[in-house]
Amino acid sequence: VRIDTRHATASLRSTNYLRLDGDKVSNAANPVMGIYPAKDGRWSYLHCNFPHHRAAALKVVGTPEDKQAVTEAVAKWDALELEEAIIAAGGAGGMVRSAAEWAEHPQGRAVASLPLMEIVKIGDSPPEALPEGDRPLSNLRVLDLTRVLAGPTCARNLAEQGADVLKISAPHIPFIEH
């Protein structure tokens, strides 16, 4: 099997290349989401795509939803203190860490012991051939119960390869268009 890594990489960022009737399809990333310099010379990442994450981050830094105001506010915080305050407020984000720092972090140590991928056999069955079709996954049926980022990207990539993908979500869960 040969894979053109340029194509594989593009598929993971395909929302940047999508067009609808000739116009670029919007990526719903919030304008204040991003990486900011902190007071201690470190960097802080604020994840603000979901309304509750955005509200928590803005409450902690004490600003309106304005990129310049957030930049100025984050610059008054030490990166680790801001991470802890945002997490305590129910938000998402963190101090940017080096690979060595991540390896020493409790969460980094926890995931380091896990395999990159694990396949769990859930039952016995005879092998089945893939259905015939003009694409590699033609006629394969996929139920997409994912929510953000990697899950929907994988579901879309499966559909691009011919799978019939049905997405199921709940009305109370915030939706981010991709």
Where in this protein do the model-derived segments appear?
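Acyl-CoA thioester-binding alpha/beta core of soluble enzymes
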Residues: 1-175
